[in-house]
Amino acid sequence: MVSSALKLEPKVDVRRANQRKHTDLDWLDSWHSFSFGRHYDPANTHFGLLLVSNDDVVKPGMGFETHPHRDMEIVTWVLEGSLVHEDSKGNTGMIYPGLAQRMSAGTGIQHSEKNDSWRLDDEPHDQDVHFVQMWMPPDSRSIDPSYEQLDINRELGPVDAGSGDLVVVASGMDAHRDRRAIFIQQQHAALYAARLQSGASVELPAAAFVHLFVARGAVDLEGTGPLDTGDAARMTAAGGQRVTAGTKGAEVLVWEMAARLAN
């Protein structure tokens, strides 16, 4: 159940990269911001509407075999390498840095995700794929499954020379209906990304819940202090703080959420 009628006190909860739970397999190195799989913590099941934020590295030729999902909005953001998606509805796509992907599981879908882009007429490679995958519930259960991807590299700028803009990546909010972004079936949430050169900054949106994840580099969060790669800030009743990149630049992912999952 989702609750949007909220009375909240301003708060910033910093979660360091090394506080996350860790899954280390031969083919997978995964860091979990929230409870996931065998890593269950009843005090850390979600923030706002965000249920999963996994920071994954998958070795070449390996990946997640076909598995099911239902009633979940899943957004994937690649940082390095490429990830191949295939699902039971006939969708196939190669996801790379700056290309956002969304899968709405709805009534049920099965898919695989693998680091084997050479199957799509590419050259074999030995590069890991590094990506962040985020899950949240949809507004309505049992919708038709769907898939969408969108390249927003033009808006973001190059990894090493970012535009410095906070770009809408995925949204179900009415305010973003006319924006170039992938659509998610969740009217209370939007995902932004920014690639920041050294010293560049962006202003965070005002929202009941804001989740800031440092995907690359390091930043300074106004009023809080430094955040390094893999760190996150969970902000309640937030808005207006500036995020400034450190000397090596940064890439950040920001969720704006106007509701939370009811306890």
Question: Where in this protein do the model-derived segments appear?
Answer:
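Jelly-roll (double-stranded beta-helix
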Residues: M1-N263
